[in-house]
Amino acid sequence: MNRTMKTAVGMLAVAAMAVPLAACGGGSGSSGDNGKGSVYFLNFKPEAADQWTALAKEYTDETGVQVKVQTAASGTYEQQLKSELAKSEAPTIFQVNGPVGYQNWKGYTADLTDSDIYKEMNDQSLALKGDDGQIVGVPYVIESYGIIYNKDIVAKYTALDGAVIKSADEIKDFDTLKKVADDMQKRKKDLGIEGAFTSAGFDSSSDWRFKTHLANIPLYYQFKKDDITAPPASIKDMYMDNFKNIFDLYITDSTTPKTQLSSKTGDDASSEFALGKAAFYQNGTWAWSDLQKAGMKADSIGMIPIYIGVDDKTEGLATGSENYWCINSKVSDANQKASLEFLKWVISSDKGKKALSEDMGFTTPFKTFNDVKTDNPLIQDANKSIQNAELTQVAWDFSMMPSEEYKNVLGQAMLNYAQGTGDWNAVVDAFVNNWKTEYDAAH
């Protein structure tokens, strides 16, 4: 996986819409009529199940090619994929979440180097490469995360006597972010807030923001420095002080006492931010839907990178994907061809583009979506970051973390540290040494 993501991803899609869970099909996994082949897509995203099924029907009505869509229940995709791939009529299109997922299914991934979906990518460095350098996965959802900020609260702060900045545009490094957050925390009564940052909750609905997304930042810089592009057997003790500094900022300049973080949820943090109780909130482009529903206006929020003091001057937002299309190399040539034609139609036809960008609310990396406008202010900021030639987007290297258990152990160590029941050395141990433990267990 290429370390840089400088090329513009293009104008991206609207915020995701939640829909009821469904798992349904239509058509057969057989070769189809007239040698056209057929398509069987095992979908990973339950929230988009209905939309995929409707889109499959549209394609069948238009082309006569049978398309079956089946959606795995949340948290069961790997298990269901294993079961379905063992059947005679196996999925022709399936998904992996990145390099670790690829290792599980690399015996089934066709070469997509010459495919239209790969050729239509704005930034081909985002594609997933196999062990031999071939393209084995094409991302169809691109997302960005960082520190979301309330423009109104920041503006109110800059108007105070002695404010350390005159504009949010001056927050371009960790040192400035810390000075602003520390000062806001001291003057929270003047600002009408409860803390500079929303609660860093470690309930399961929120802990991924820290054990995965925040931990990704020091991991990214380590992998960038050592030119690591595939999951390593071990990692080094690098940038741990930087990791500690940003986490300390989150839990010190906060709306919530450290002793209460274990029970704080993702909804708590979202609500605190939407109600103006905090100026800063670590999350991503997907958060806009909930914030908008809570009454926030598009012109009142923005997003900046998670600065940790390594290469702040050139750091962009954390941009990547956990959703890669793969074509099953074990099915017939006719079905492989039919599957690639279906995906080409999905990203190029008006019906397909509308389904992805509006109905499913996906942010897409294809040139065919460059004319798609968005009213999501966080995606607008992501576009600016991606299109800024002076910035390098932070890769989603957490996709190379060896296991879910690795993340859980790290998260527990971070919570213990935050609550005062553990020390930072335990976090370093969970981050560095447990990587090798979990990698060895998986291999």
What are these regions (language model features)?
Residues 179-182, 226-263:
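Glycine-centered hinge/linker elements that transmit conformational signals in sensory
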Residues 97-155, 209, 302-305, 375:
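Hinge/lid segment of periplasmic solute-binding proteins
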Residues 4-14, 21-101, 117-119, 310-312, ...:
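Conserved N-terminal structural module of periplasmic/extracytoplasmic solute-binding proteins
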Residues 71-80, 172-176, 260-275:
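Short helix-initiation/N-cap motifs at beta->coil->alpha
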Residues 136-140, 145, 175-231, 278:
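Extracytoplasmic/periplasmic solute-binding protein
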Residues 353, 364-366, 370-374, 388-443:
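Conserved C-terminal helix/tail region of periplasmic/extracytoplasmic solute-binding proteins
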Residues 66, 255, 294-361:
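Extracytoplasmic/periplasmic substrate-recognition and gating elements
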Residues 113-127, 166-170, 201-204, 219-245, ...:
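Short, solvent-exposed loop/beta-turn-alpha elements that line the ligand-binding surface or hinge
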